């Protein structure tokens, strides 16, 4: 989710100016990256807060003092680490992609809808990505992507629920479940063999 600056300030016991200086330093050192909130006038009540990511999941684990075993044992932490990992992969691929998509996130103000990552292409087309710490996500894991598809119509060119399992399969119209490994390889379609 998106953490408001006020929550970070209060938790760290620092003022806004100090937090801003630390944030600039960490960004300049390429330790964190801020991903902007996606916005369109076609949707109402979208949160405009940037989402912060630690650039490297290995550094994230070291700072938190956690091991792979402890990450796997805590579902929320695993989800956040996987989300960070996927964003890092997409950031690298988007930088060298001919299409040069913008990377965003989406969350409505009341929190009813949240999509981990949005790719926006030059013509305004949008591709949504949900990251799940599950080996076999179901249609309920695509509910926010379906909502966005229904809101945007043809501007929504597709969506994927990335997961930890090995299979590629359809979830809904223009939405599939695919293994995270498909970020760097072609997933095997069980229908093809």
Features from the language model and the residues they span:
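Residues at alpha-helix caps and immediate loop-helix transition turns in enzyme cores, especially N-
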Residues: 140-144
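Short beta-strand/turn micro-motifs composed of small residues
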Residues: 132, 162-163
């Amino acid at each position: 989710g998106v953490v408001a600056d006020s929550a970070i300030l209060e938790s760290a016991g620092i003022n806004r100016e100090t937090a801003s200086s630390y944030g600039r330093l960490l960004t300049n050192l390429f330790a964190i990256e801020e991903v902007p909130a996606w916005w369109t006038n076609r949707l109402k009540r979208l949160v405009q807060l940037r989402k912060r990511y630690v650039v490297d999941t290995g550094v994230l684990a070291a700072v938190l003092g956690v091991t792979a075993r402890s990450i796997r044992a805590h579902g929320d932490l695993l989800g956040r680490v996987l989300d960070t990992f996927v964003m890092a992969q997409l950031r690298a691929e988007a930088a060298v992609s001919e299409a040069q998509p913008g990377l965003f996130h989406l969350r409505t103000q009341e929190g009813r809808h949240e999509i981990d990552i949005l790719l926006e292409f030059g013509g305004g087309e949008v591709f949504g990505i949900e990251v799940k710490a599950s080996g076999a996500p179901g249609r309920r894991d695509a509910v926010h992507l379906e909502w966005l598809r229904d809101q945007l119509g043809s501007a929504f060119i597709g969506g994927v629920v990335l997961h930890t399992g090995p299979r590629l399969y359809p979830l809904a119209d223009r939405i599939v479940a695919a293994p995270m490994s498909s970020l760097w390889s072609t997933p095997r379609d069980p229908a093809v063999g």
